[in-house]
């Protein structure tokens, strides 16, 4: 028992290596840009001040969003979704999955749960002993169920979900701006270095490598940010993109899509002044989400005939019409 526990601790430490790699690369880029580029290569004091101000603004917002994405723990389901001792005993006594289904169904009747497994059963986590809320998944790395789980990010050593997805989006945005700023401001100097007008080999190496690394990261981050913007405006998670969520009557690829604006507000909130800052402002509690009455493009309607359909909620703003929501 002692050895596996020790191995688990060592594995947790190894998970921090990618985070340290990111920190080291960013700190080196800070050194290369501020010292080698701004202080050594730039001759114009005005240009130096402007570049340093813009750089530190991007660096500050990047660092803030990075820290929030790394340090904010993923939200787990509340106590009401967890099995009581008696429920667990009753559930474990049944060895057949068919016999267990009525137990899960009875307990889930009191909960706002609409998603199902591909076979139509109630989604249950055997590790955490709880009924999974809609869009909740168990992370094998974090060893817990995560509300509205998007993915486990290797470079942040954290699960991206309901509590920190906004921070992840801002992290991508400010990372891209950080790289683009470096590329756009350093490129003219790189051209001079290429033409041989600057001869310091150490400075040349740092600046050339800085531009190359920043350009590569900028291209990668651009595609990643575009992908997550599409997910955000479609109200999908990465896991839902990979595997369509199922409901009582079948799959629902657009079940949570309540319109681009409302989808955006679910993550970033209604307070516009907080949109660009890594401060939590998402709507809801992460356990239940508005459902669209729009038909699934690859399956039957996302609604259950034994339950109510047409529950009205105001999703975007009081000035807009209420969105009709089908409760499965």
Swiss-Prot record:
Membrane topology designation: Multi-pass membrane protein
Entry-linked Pfam families: DHHC (PF01529)
The keyword Transferase belongs to this UniProt entry's keyword annotation: yes
Catalysis performed (reactions): L-cysteinyl-[protein] + hexadecanoyl-CoA = S-hexadecanoyl-L-cysteinyl-[protein] + CoA; L-cysteinyl-[protein] + tetradecanoyl-CoA = S-tetradecanoyl-L-cysteinyl-[protein] + CoA; L-cysteinyl-[protein] + octadecanoyl-CoA = S-octadecanoyl-L-cysteinyl-[protein] + CoA
Topology Cytoplasmic: residue spans: 1-14, 70-166, 228-328
Protein residues bound to Zn(2+) 1: 125, 128, 138, 145
Entry EC number(s): 2.3.1.225, 2.3.1.-
PTM notes: Autopalmitoylated (in vitro).
Lumenal side: 36-48, 188-206
Sequence ranges assigned to domain DHHC in this UniProt record: 123-173
Role of this protein: Palmitoyltransferase that catalyzes the addition of palmitate onto various protein substrates. Has no stringent fatty acid selectivity and in addition to palmitate can also transfer onto target proteins myristate from tetradecanoyl-CoA and stearate from octadecanoyl-CoA. May thereby regulate target proteins association and localization to membranes.
Recorded domain comment: The DHHC domain is required for palmitoyltransferase activity.
Protein name, UniProt field: Palmitoyltransferase ZDHHC15A
